[in-house]
Structure formats: C-alpha cells, structure tokens
C-alpha cells in the first residue's frame, strides 16, 4: 500500500509507476483504492463510475478499468455535500458531518466486496493499494476506510511517501509514524522522498537521519517530475500552467468552482501548437481562439457563479463577436436556454422555482431527472467530419431542442440527444456534447482544431502519427523509467 504524509504527496503517480514497474518484471499488478474523493471520473465497460486515477493505474497495469478497483467514490457537490458511489453506482448524497455515521458500515462492505470480486476473478496478481490523504488524522482515524484499517485487514506492506517540495519533510515523516499504533508501524517497510529539486547528494545526511530515527529504509528520492497526467484534485489545476512559445491556437477553459472531468482536456496539454489558459469566474475572458466550458458537478450553481461574476455576459459577448465555444456535459447545459430541476437534484430544496435561465446560445432545454445515465458509447459524429467516436456518458440532465427553427443548428451525432452545434456564416461555432472523452478521438480532435485554424487563416495540421493512447503509454513509460532510476526496486518488490 502506498501511504502519504498528506494529500497531494504523490501517492497516485507512485502507485501508477509501481503498477507499470511490476508489469515490466512479469508480474500482474491489480490497482485498488478503497475510497477516493474526486470529480474526475471514468465509466467502465459495465457503465459504472470510478475515479479516473484508478482507471489510469489499471492502464498502467495492462488491465481494463473496473469499478471494483475503486469501490467507494465520493464526488463533491459543494456545501460540504458529496454524491456517494458504491461499486460504480450512485447510492445517495451525504453531508460531511454525517458521512461516517451514515455510510461507514456500507462503505466498508463495498470495499470488501470489491476486493472479493477482484481476488476471485481470473486476474492472478499482486494488489497495489493506494491510501488517501494522511493515514493519521486522529479525529477521523477510527472511521478511516482506506488507509491503515484496510492495510491491517490485508496485512499489506506499506510505503510512506513524503513531499519535500512542501517543506518540513522530517516532521512529516516522524510525525506520521509517531501517530501510528505499534501494529501499524510494523507495516511500514519503506519511505520515499518525492519532488526533490537539486543535487540529491545534499540530502544524503537527511536520508541517514531518517533511517536512524525510524528504523525504516529510505527506498529512494524521486526528483520533481513535471505533471504529465491530470491532477486528481481541482485545487491543483491552476498550478498546471503550460507555456508554449510555438503555440498558434489559444484555448481558454472556464475553471468552474465545481469542475468535473477535467481529464477531458488532457489531450490538448501535449499539443505544442496549443496554449491552454484557465479562467476563473471574475477574471477577464479576453479573446481566445476557442472557449471550452467543461463538466460541472453542480451545473446550476456553477452557472449562478458565472452570472454573479459577469463571466456569463462576457461569454455571450464573445459569441456575438464570432467567438468559438464548446461545452462538455454541464458546459453544454449552461449554453442552452433553460435548465429545469423538478426533482431538486441540483437546486436548493427550499427554492420555489425549478426553472433556471441558461446563456441562450443554443436552443435547447435541459431537465434534470432522477436517473443517472452512465455508459460507454461509440457513436457516429457528423461535424466537423463524419466518423465513429468513442466516449462515455455520465449525467442526470437530459437536453432537447426547444424548436428547430434555427436552420444553422445540427445534431453532432446520429443519436441527436448527445449534442448540437451551430456553425455561423463567419465559420465561428457554438456547440457541445454529453460525450466525455470526445477529445481523445485523435482524428476528430485534429479536424476540430483545424476548423479553428481555418477561421484564423492558418494551415490545416495533419493528424499526429502518435495517437492519444500511444502518448499515454509513452508517458506511463517515462514515469516508470524515472521511478526505476531513483528507487531501490529490489527492496520495493520484496
């Protein structure tokens, strides 16, 4: 099990690297995180939700993602409330203050069931477990589902990861171990120092001191590695800055307060022809070549935030001046005329009205129902090129055209409920889709970008020889190469 001294210590990428490392050595790793809190989700082949980070780890391990690898997923909705997902299916919502009392027992059962299914499957391998946050939050430790309780249940060998970039690495390590019970300390078999900058020789005395004080070997010091995969926590998004001096196209993305599935945008970060710019509510939109409004865990509340800060008006003016806009899931819903919430899925329960005005840039009406749609899809797209696309749905709202008097609007897909686009005479467009992962389709993404390049007077670019899956595999290998170079693998895998 990979434990961390804090949130953001680097557990996810280290567990991901261990999966690929073991796979290289002929073993079959099986990633597992008992409970995760994230709005960056994936949908498996059975239409079940799981954290994107565990999907990434499964690809690193050479496995198909399955919800059993992440039996409990908490998806924050704001106001200290989260949607609770057990084994891929939504089972309710919970206030943070009530979560442990109301959901601890059923969560633990979901974790044990997920483990049992994985261990009884045809996969014969070694579990690579990832903890969450700090394992020694004394006020929560007795109700901690996914750290030391799970480690003791499985008698798992544990690695403690500390982030030296944050400072205070000695206190992080000593303090974490000091707060463990004797039977928990025995499980810690190694320590990894993460995100070290500079000459590692300068830290040799630090390694000696840590090993002397703890009696636990330091397995290695990982250098600062540029973030090559989407951060699990939206708080890290603004730290993910990209400066491409050769960029010819600027994509602006609205950083919604309750943003979800920002992994949809990941294919753009490795494109040297594109500059990405995050915009928070209250900031100036400027004049990007295209604006993307991503998914939201609370579409109506995020739309209200855009309205209050004036960003909605900026977006409308940008559209009037010929700006290109594309929304994904919640972003698509915001672009419509109305958003109706009769079952109070997103609205405040005490509100008398359930109808909310959208930006009215697309003639669609969204109604939030009680049933969540989650499924992988392969659909025929009609714009800007005709081809088959793969992606997944994950939404409560259903959208329909209010009327079809606007001759410019077309359905993006043969299945007309999945998205629409209006292409204007000046070649600008406003559109959107419910299909997450749409930009991972390489040919379609390139044609979409070429549409923007054409309007700007730039030449069309050819499709990259390296597709998105190949890029992901290459990055996983680069991550693992760095891991193997700096970590004592022989001790690690024993």
Curated annotation (Swiss-Prot):
Pathway: Cofactor biosynthesis; adenosylcobalamin biosynthesis. Keywords: Cobalamin biosynthesis, Glutamine amidotransferase. Signal peptide: none annotated. The keyword ATP-binding does not apply. The active site is at 329 (nucleophile), 436. The keyword Chaperone does not apply. Gene3D superfamilies: 3.40.50.880, P-loop containing nucleotide triphosphate hydrolases. GO terms for molecular function: ABC-type vitamin B12 transporter activity; catalytic activity. Disulfide bonds: none annotated. Residues 248-444 form the GATase cobBQ-type domain. Pfam families: CbiA, GATase_3. One of its GO terms (biological process) is cobalamin biosynthetic process. Belongs to the CobB/CobQ family. CobQ subfamily. Catalyzes amidations at positions B, D, E, and G on adenosylcobyrinic A,C-diamide. NH(2) groups are provided by glutamine, and one molecule of ATP is hydrogenolyzed for each amidation. This is Cobyric acid synthase. The lineage of its organism: Bacteria, Bacillati, Cyanobacteriota, Cyanophyceae, Synechococcales. The gene is cobQ.
């Amino acid at each position: 099990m990979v434990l961390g001294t804090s949130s953001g210590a680097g557990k996810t990428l280290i567990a991901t690297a261990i999966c690929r490392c073991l796979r290289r050595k002929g073993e079959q790793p099986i990633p597992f995180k008992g409970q995760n809190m994230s709005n960056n989700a994936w949908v498996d082949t059975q239409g079940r939700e799981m954290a994107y980070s565990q999907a990434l780890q499964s690809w690193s391990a050479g496995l198909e993602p399955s919800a059993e690898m992440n039996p409990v997923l908490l998806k924050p909705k704001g106001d200290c409330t989260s949607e609770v997902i057990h084994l891929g299916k939504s089972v309710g919502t919970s206030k943070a203050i009530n979560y442990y009392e109301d959901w601890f027992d059923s969560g633990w059962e979901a974790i044990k069931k997920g483990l049992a299914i994985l261990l009884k499957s045809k996969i014969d391998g070694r579990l690579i477990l990832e903890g969450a946050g700090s394992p020694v939050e004394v006020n929560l430790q007795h109700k901690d589902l996914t750290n030391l309780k799970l480690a003791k249940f499985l008698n798992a060998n544990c690695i403690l990861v500390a982030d030296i970039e944050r400072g205070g690495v000695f206190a992080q390590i000593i303090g974490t171990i000091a707060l463990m019970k004797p039977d928990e300390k025995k499980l810690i078999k190694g320590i990894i120092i993460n995100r070290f900058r500079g000459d590692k020789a300068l830290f040799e005395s630090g390694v000696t001191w840590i090993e002397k004080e703890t009696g636990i070997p330091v397995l290695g010091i990982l250098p600062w590695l540029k973030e090559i995969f989407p951060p699990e926590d939206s708080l890290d998004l603004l730290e993910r800055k990209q400066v491409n001096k050769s960029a010819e196209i600027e994509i602006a993305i609205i950083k919604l307060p309750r943003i979800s599935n920002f992994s949809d945008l990941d294919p753009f970060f490795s494109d040297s022809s594109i500059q990405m710019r995050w915009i928070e509510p209250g900031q100036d939109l400027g004049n990007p070549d295209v604006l993307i409004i991503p998914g939201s865990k609370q579409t109506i509340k995020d739309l209200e935030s855009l309205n209050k800060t004036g960003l909605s008006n900026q977006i409308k003016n940008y559209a009037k001046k010929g700006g290109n806009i594309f929304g994904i899931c919640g972003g698509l819903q915001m672009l419509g005329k109305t958003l109706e919430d009769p079952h109070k899925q997103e609205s405040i329960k005490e509100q008398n009205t359930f109808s909310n005005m959208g930006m009215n840039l697309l003639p669609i009406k969204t109604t939030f129902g009680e049933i969540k749609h989650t499924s992988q899809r392969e659909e025929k797209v009609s714009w800007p090129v005709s081809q088959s696309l793969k992606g997944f749905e994950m939404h409560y709202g259903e959208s329909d055209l209010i009327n079809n008097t606007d001759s410019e609007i077309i359905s993006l897909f043969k299945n007309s409920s999945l998205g629409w686009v209006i292409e204007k005479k000046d070649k600008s467009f406003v559109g959107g889709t419910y299909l997450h992962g749409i930009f991972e389709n390489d040919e379609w993404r390139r044609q979409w970008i070429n549409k923007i390049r054409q309007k700007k007077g730039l030449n069309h670019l050819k499709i990259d020889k390296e597709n998105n899956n190949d890029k992901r595999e290459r990055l996983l290998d680069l991550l693992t190469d760095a891991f193997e170079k700096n970590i004592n693998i022989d001790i690690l895998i024993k």
